[in-house]
């Protein structure tokens, strides 16, 4: 709502309107300010009657016949005494260099602001309107229209004389006119007409709707949205008219253009002025209301509405009631709405006031959001439009937002917003921390404090740590873990923790936190001691990370008690730092832990701990019998006699059997299996492993009077011992379980062996035949003999240099060649000849495959 001086009316109606506006949550679309400076001076002595607006200046007409040129701040730049009576209208061309003025006493002046007077005439009736050609500055466009009882078009001829033509008359006074391009629109008592100055034709007549209203009290408002769109406001009716070209086939005797009403609707109040705003309309309305107390009609504040025109109705976008000076005495005809197209400025003119309405910019939007305490939206709007805002700073809005959240008690949200708003400003961070301290909310801001860039004073971090230490051990521990140790004075915090431990020495949270502080302070010994006391999982990580092996040599038992697996792995991985001997010595009083260590050592390397293998026999026997036999099998350093003694003492049969067999006493081992274990399958398996005929004989002898053992032997020995030997020894009449099945199995095994042998024989014969054929094919191939070959005996060329001379050559399958005379004569026992070289090398004898003679 426009700023206004305080009114002394104190009317109920005005205060009601104000309260309604205050409660509205809808953001206004326009902002208002009173045009002051020179305008205030003028209106203190005179009253405004009309005004026109140019991009560069304003022209204001008064009831006392004065015309003032004003700058956009309202300062007077020029004054014209045109008439002693009311100025009815002022018109400017687009260049702003020429002005037309008409007054109630019939005077009309058209003159250049910088070039002097061009037209001056006094008519015999009041002239209500004047409009100069938009391009009046051009010599070809020296035209203007005036309106009183008739509409006259003045045009300067080629001899610099003005001639006039009547465009319209006979329908009452001309009360409004607007010139745009080649079209002139005017309103009289009957309606609105449009004239085309190019075709010299009147192209439309839009009749007025409500003829009951006096046209002098409720004048028509006209404005051109563009060169072809005229907006008409009269009474409570609004029409949007579009000027269109008529198709050539439709012209005949009709004008080349016609008007189509594209939108028509009624408003709630009487229209005093219209202006376009993009695709919307700005409407100045004269409002009359009825008092609830007196039931009399009174003049209320005028309204400035932004509406969206539709085809048959409209949508209200915003509506503002304007507190202009003297609105209680004004009539509908006293208000005017002028606008500047280039800057979207709207001037509400009344006799005692001129108010400027502007589209709200981003700064205004932020002002409204802050006023409504919508700080989050204001901050977002400022960030998005930070290049366009002039009056606001993002930081100031953010600080106001933080203060608002704190006042509302949303401490966590306020603290979280500090990260974004305060950024890297260390001074502001420290200021906000102290503010949170004053309200006892240091805990709220602690998670969001900067930890790197920027870094605050150590005192800030220490203050927060002390706050947590007094009331929240877990929170204190969390901060110590999360905050880098260089943010605060470590020794100060260590001392504070130790003071608290004096009151609660067994508090695990404080102990663990103290260990972490010691670690950061490189006091690893104290940290390790606490970790071991707490049996904390990070103890191994601490040892590895800081190479604390020298500190744990006397703490091996503690480590093993805490986590034997991790401890053993660590000790074995670092044998160079803690020797095997040292570990075994430390664990001497804890043989169960000693076994765990030595067992893992043996798994890694069978030879490293060989000196302890004898000890390990008793350790395995005591703590880990399942792994004793594998150990005995894999170890090459344990004393067998000692092992046998221990196993026999503990009656470990399987281990004793293994040791007896390993020491060569297989018969005793077999006997133990039979007598102690009574396991024929294991006995048979043992006999198979040893593959000793005497063992089989002992096994048969032991089993011959035990039917279950005989069954086991019959089922398993068929592939190692002739079953007949066992069957012949079975006593007559002895009942043997499953004998038939056992005999059938023996026969099946026997048949299977025969089939396997026959199959093998067939394969061997087939392979032999195949190889024989291959050898035959190879031996049947020819052998190349040429001059390069030599006799293997005399080493001379195998072929004579004289081809006519007779020769005899022998070539063996081994490819060695001899002169026949160089070979020894066959013996009496064998007529076959063999290669001397291959025979000398103990190779298989090769017989001659070719004998060449000539």
From Swiss-Prot:
GO BP of this protein: cellular response to starvation; endosomal vesicle fusion; endosome to lysosome transport; Golgi vesicle transport; late endosome to lysosome transport; macroautophagy; protein targeting to vacuole; regulation of SNARE complex assembly
Domain of life of the organism encoding this protein: Eukaryota
Tissue: Expressed in cerebral cortex and cerebellum. Highly expressed in Purkinje cells.
Result, substituting residue 13 to G: In SCAR29; uncertain significance; no effect on protein expression
Annotated GO CC locations: clathrin-coated vesicle; cytosol; early endosome membrane; endosome membrane; Golgi apparatus; Golgi-associated vesicle; HOPS complex; late endosome
Variant or mutagenesis effect after changing residue 285 to P: In SCAR29; decreased protein abundance; cannot form a functional HOPS complex; causes a kinetic defect in the endosome-lysosome fusion process
Membrane protein topology class: Peripheral membrane protein
Region feature (Disordered): 1-33
First and last residues of each zinc finger (RING-type): 791-839
Molecular function via GO: identical protein binding; microtubule binding; zinc ion binding
Reported effect, residue 791 to F: In SCAR29; decreased protein abundance
Gene3D superfamilies in UniProt: Tetratricopeptide repeat domain (1.25.40.10), YVTN repeat-like/Quinoprotein amine dehydrogenase (2.130.10.10)
Composition bias, Acidic residues: 14-26
Record key words, sorted: Autophagy, Cytoplasm, Cytoplasmic vesicle, Disease variant, Endosome, Golgi apparatus, Lysosome, Membrane, Metal-binding, Neurodegeneration, Protein transport, Spinocerebellar ataxia, Transport, Zinc, Zinc-finger
UniProt region (Interaction with ARL8B), positions on chain: 1-540
Keyword Lyase part of the UniProt annotation: no
Biological function: Plays a role in vesicle-mediated protein trafficking to lysosomal compartments including the endocytic membrane transport and autophagic pathways. Acts as a component of the HOPS endosomal tethering complex. This complex is proposed to be involved in the Rab5-to-Rab7 endosome conversion probably implicating MON1A/B, and via binding SNAREs and SNARE complexes to mediate tethering and docking events during SNARE-mediated membrane fusion.
Family the UniProt entry places it in: Belongs to the VPS41 family.
Assembly mode: Component of the homotypic fusion and vacuole protein sorting (HOPS) complex; the core of which composed of the class C Vps proteins VPS11, VPS16, VPS18 and VPS33A, is associated with VPS39 and VPS41. Interacts with RILP, MON1B. Interacts with ARL8B (GTP-bound form); involved in recruitment to lysosomes and probably hierarchial assembly of the HOPS complex at lysosomal membranes. In vitro can self-assemble into a lattice. Associates with adapter protein complex 3 (AP-3) and clathrin:AP-3 complexes. Interacts with STX17; this interaction is increased in the absence of TMEM39A. (Microbial infection) The interaction with STX17 is decreased in presence of SARS coronavirus-2/SARS-CoV-2 ORF3A protein.
Other noteworthy facts: Protective against both alpha-synuclein and neurotoxic-mediated injury in invertebrate and cellular models of Parkinson's disease (PD); the function requires the AP-3 adapter complex and the HOPS complex.
Full protein name: Vacuolar protein sorting-associated protein 41 homolog
């Amino acid at each position: 709502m426009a700023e206004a001086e305080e009114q002394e009316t104190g009317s109920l109606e005005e205060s009601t309107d104000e309260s309604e506006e205050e409660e509205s949550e809808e953001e206004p679309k326009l902002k208002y300010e009173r045009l002051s400076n020179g305008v205030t001076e003028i209106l203190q002595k005179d009253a405004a009657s009309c005004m026109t607006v140019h991009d560069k200046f304003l022209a204001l007409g008064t009831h006392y016949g004065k015309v003032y040129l004003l700058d956009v701040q309202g300062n007077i730049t020029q004054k014209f005494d045109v008439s002693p009576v009311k100025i009815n209208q002022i018109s400017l061309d687009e260049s702003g260099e020429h002005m037309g003025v008409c007054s109630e006493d019939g005077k009309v002046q058209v003159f250049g602001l910088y070039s002097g007077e061009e037209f001056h005439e006094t008519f015999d009736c009041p002239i209500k309107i004047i409009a100069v050609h938009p391009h009046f500055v051009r010599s070809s466009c020296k035209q203007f229209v005036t309106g009183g009882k008739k509409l006259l078009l003045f045009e300067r001829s080629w001899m610099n004389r003005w001639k006039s033509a009547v465009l319209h008359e006979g329908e009452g006074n001309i009360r409004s006119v607007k010139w745009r391009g080649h079209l002139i629109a005017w309103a009289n008592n009957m309606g609105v007409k449009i004239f085309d100055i190019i075709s010299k034709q009147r192209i439309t007549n839009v009749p007025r709707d409500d003829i009951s209203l006096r046209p002098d009290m409720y004048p028509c408002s006209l404005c051109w949205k563009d060169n072809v769109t005229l907006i008409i406001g009269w009474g409570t009716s609004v029409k949007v008219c579009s000027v269109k070209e008529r198709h050539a086939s439709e012209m005949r005797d009709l004008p080349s253009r016609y008007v189509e009403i594209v939108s028509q609707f009624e408003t709630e109040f009487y229209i005093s002025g219209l202006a376009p705003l993009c695709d919307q309309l700005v409407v100045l309305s004269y409002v009359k209301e009825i008092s609830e107390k007196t039931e009399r009609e009174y003049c209320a504040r005028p309204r400035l509405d932004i509406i969206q025109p539709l085809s048959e109705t409209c949508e209200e976008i915003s509506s503002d009631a304007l507190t202009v000076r003297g609105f209680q005495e004004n009539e509908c005809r006293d208000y005017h709405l002028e606008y500047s197209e280039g800057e979207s400025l709207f001037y509400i003119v009344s006799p005692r006031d001129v108010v400027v309405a502007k589209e709200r910019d981003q700064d205004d939007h932020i002002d409204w959001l802050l006023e409504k305490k919508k700080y989050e939206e204001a901050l977002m709007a400022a960030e998005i439009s930070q290049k366009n805002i002039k009056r606001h700073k993002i930081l100031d809005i953010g600080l106001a937002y933080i203060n608002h959240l704190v006042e509302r008690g949303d401490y966590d949200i306020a603290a979280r917003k500090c990260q974004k708003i305060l950024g890297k400003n260390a001074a502001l961070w420290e200021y906000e921390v102290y503010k949170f301290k004053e309200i006892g909310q240091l805990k709220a801001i602690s998670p969001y404090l900067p930890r790197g860039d920027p870094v605050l004073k150590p005192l800030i971090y220490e203050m927060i740590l002390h706050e947590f230490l007094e009331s929240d051990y877990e929170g204190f521990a969390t901060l110590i873990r999360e905050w880098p140790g260089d943010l605060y004075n470590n020794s100060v915090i260590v001392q504070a923790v130790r003071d608290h431990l004096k009151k609660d020495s067994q508090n695990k949270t404080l102990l663990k936190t103290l260990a972490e502080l010691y670690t950061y302070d490189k006091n690893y010994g104290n940290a390790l001691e606490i970790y071991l006391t707490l049996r904390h999982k990070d103890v191994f990580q601490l040892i590895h990370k800081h190479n604390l092996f020298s500190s744990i040599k006397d703490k091996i038992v503690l480590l093993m008690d805490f986590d034997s697996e991790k401890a053993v792995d660590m000790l074995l991985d670092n044998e160079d730092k803690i020797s095997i001997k040292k570990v075994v010595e430390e664990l001497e009083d804890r043989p169960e832990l000693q076994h765990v260590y030595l067992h893992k050592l043996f798994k890694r390397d069978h030879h490293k701990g060989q000196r302890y293998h004898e000890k390990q026999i008793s350790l395995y026997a005591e703590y880990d019998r399942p792994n004793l036999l594998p150990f005995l099998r894999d170890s090459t350093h344990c004393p067998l006699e000692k092992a046998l003694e221990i196993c026999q003492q503990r009656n470990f049969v399987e281990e004793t059997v293994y040791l007896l067999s390993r020491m060569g006493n297989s018969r005793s081992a077999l006997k133990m299996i039979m007598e102690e274990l009574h396991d024929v399958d294991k006995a048979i398996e043992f006999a198979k492993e040893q593959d000793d005929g005497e063992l089989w004989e002992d096994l048969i002898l032991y089993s011959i009077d035990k039917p279950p053992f005989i069954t086991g032997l019959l089922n398993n020995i068929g592939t190692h011992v002739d079953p007949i030997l066992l069957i012949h020894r079975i006593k007559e009449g002895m009942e043997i379980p499953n004998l038939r099945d056992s005999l059938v199995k023996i026969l099946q095994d026997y048949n299977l062996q025969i089939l396997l042998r026959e199959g093998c024989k067939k394969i061997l014969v087939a392979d032999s035949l195949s190889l024989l054929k291959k050898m035959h094919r190879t031996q049947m191939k020819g052998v190349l003999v040429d001059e390069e070959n030599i006799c293997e005996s005399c080493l001379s060329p195998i072929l004579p240099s004289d081809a006519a001379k007779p020769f005899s050559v022998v070539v063996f399958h081994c490819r060695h060649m001899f002169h026949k005379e160089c070979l020894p004569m066959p013996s009496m026992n064998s007529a076959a000849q063999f290669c001397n070289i291959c025979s000398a090398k103990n190779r298989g004898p090769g017989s001659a495959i070719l004998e060449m003679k000539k």
